[in-house]
Regions:
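Catalytic domains of carbohydrate-active enzymes, especially glycoside hydrolases
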Residues: 187-212, 279-284, 356, 362, ...
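Aromatic-lined carbohydrate-recognition surfaces of secreted/lumenal glycan-active proteins
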Residues: 175-180, 235-239, 286, 290, ...
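Substrate-binding cleft/loops of secretory-pathway carbohydrate-active enzymes
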Residues: 334-372, 407-413
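Aromatic-lined substrate-binding rim segments of carbohydrate-active enzymes
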Residues: 192, 203-243, 302-329
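Substrate-binding cleft of secreted/luminal carbohydrate-active enzymes
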Residues: 365-378, 382, 394-456
Length: 456
């Protein structure tokens, strides 16, 4: 059974236990802790770094301290010198191979330990060991090892680093929210948002119209400001290859059997994603309609050209460019994608999870069980999830419904919390690590606070 617990900045967590043995308590460095380690020397074009937090109310000079590395090649080698570094009260510093404040990289692919102390074995202020503290798990290219909470908490493995910002636990439970429901979320001092937070829903996928419609943008800002106060992550729910409610082909037919990817379309969508981050400070972007329409001439397989341009290539290239753009920003922006389910998704829609997973942090397959004329069974739900788990380093949060259909009854029927929970428990018995409910204002919602901690 899956035992993955939660996401920090929308991040994958696997709890480990810190071992403070050997740490010095009276050396003038009390209050210093290692809060985050990005061990990336085994990953191309990616820096290693270590974040140190001063939890005390006073300024601390790091003169006399060093960071010492133990791995298969180094046996207590000092990899930085901290003589000229001073850390202010309740402040943090990052030592990185990028600026050579960390003179040697660290690899997460094998066991290692770093020690913050006056030497490798004396005056130890803090330490982190991969196998002991993080269950021998390596990190994603964009992830890190984080201590949560920062002041003496357990170490966890995350899919997104939080360099220079606070580490905190966000549960891997999300809900899709339309812009038309923002008034309900704001009313009565954000009573709905507080209720959803109390039930364990730490992520909101807020529809793009909340940001694009100038008459709604102010409400979106209110929601995001309150969400940050409550510890809730807001993701901009974008419609990628869909403009003005119409699907847009990302490939132009040049004639003669050749095609080209519409770079102008890619640029426009990527600029919009960056605008959501700049103007609204969203925590992530959620890609919907990152696919072909799947019907008629717009079946993905019908868009393949002799010069190598094809449907899955268009999707993968867009994801690559978006990832590159967002990784150039200082924020840890999470990228998730709504994924189609069913047979032959690559043929009809062009989505290739193995390739997309190089650039996407979280897959959110729409594991929708209920339709107007039929329903899938639990075995189908498990098989569908298995099509996404294990094919890449992307996390998989399954999208499930909060409504169903019944013969002789018109329209959707909202499900009870127990009914939604029953479907969620099917997901928990897969390798998925999170849930996304579709959608707010249909049905009721179970308490998921301890859902990923429980035995089933």
């Amino acid at each position: 059974m899956n035992k993955i617990l939660c996401v920090a900045s929308l991040a994958l967590m696997i709890a480990g236990c810190a071992d403070p043995s050997g740490q010095s308590k009276n050396n003038g460095y009390e209050g210093l802790v290692i809060t985050e380690v990005a061990a990336n020397s085994d990953k191309p074009m990616t820096d290693s770094w270590v974040e140190i937090l001063n939890t005390s109310p006073r300024e601390i000079s790091l003169a006399g301290l060093g960071i010492y590395l133990f791995d298969e090649h180094s046996k207590g080698e000092e990899i930085t010198i901290l003589d000229d570094v001073v850390v202010g009260p309740e402040s943090r510093i990052v030592l990185t191979t990028e600026d050579m404040t960390l003179v040697k990289g660290i690899s997460s692919s094998a066991d290692f330990e770093i020690v913050l102390g006056t030497s490798a074995d004396k005056g130890i202020v803090d330490r982190f060991a991969r196998n002991r503290d993080a269950a021998a798990v390596s990190t994603h290219k964009y992830g890190s090892y984080q201590r949560i909470p920062e002041k003496g908490g357990d170490w966890v493995v995350t899919s997104r680093s939080t360099r220079r910002i606070v580490n905190y636990d966000a549960k891997p439970n999300a809900i899709w929210v339309w812009s038309t429901h923002m008034d309900q979320w704001i009313a009565d001092d954000f009573a709905v948002m507080k209720q959803m937070k109390d039930l364990g829903y730490d992520h909101i996928l807020l529809n793009y119209n909340a940001f694009d419609d100038w008459s709604k943008a102010g409400k979106a800002l209110e929601i995001i400001e309150k969400a940050k106060e409550l510890g809730v992550k807001v993701h901009a729910w974008m419609q990628v290859f869909c403009e003005n409610k119409t699907w847009v082909n990302p490939i132009e037919d040049l004639g003669g059997g050749e095609g080209r990817y519409k770079q102008e379309l890619f640029d426009r969508i990527i600029a919009k994603a960056n605008k959501y981050i700049d103007d609204f400070d969203v925590d992530g972007v959620h890609l919907d309609y990152i696919r072909f329409s799947g019907s008629g001439k717009n079946v993905a397989a019908n868009n393949s050209y002799s010069n190598g341009v094809n449907a899955s290539g268009a999707i993968n290239e867009f994801c690559r460019q978006l990832r590159k753009s967002l990784d150039s920003r200082p924020e840890g922006v999470v990228v998730s994608a709504a994924m189609m389910t069913g047979s032959d998704v690559l043929h009809y829609y062009g989505q290739d999870p193995e390739q997309m997973g190089k650039y996407i942090d979280i897959f959110m397959p729409m594991v929708y069980k209920y339709y107007t004329s039929y329903s899938y069974n639990n075995a189908w739900m498990k098989t569908t999830c298995a099509n996404f788990t294990g094919v890449s380093k992307a996390q998989v949060w399954a999208g499930i419904q909060t409504y169903k259909y019944e013969t002789g009854v018109s329209g959707e029927i909202g499900m009870t919390p127990d009914e939604v929970l029953a479907d969620a428990e099917v997901i928990r018995n897969t390798a998925c690590s999170g849930l996304v409910l579709f959608r707010y204002a249909l049905g009721s919602y179970p308490d998921l606070n301890t859902f990923w901690n429980e035995e089933n």
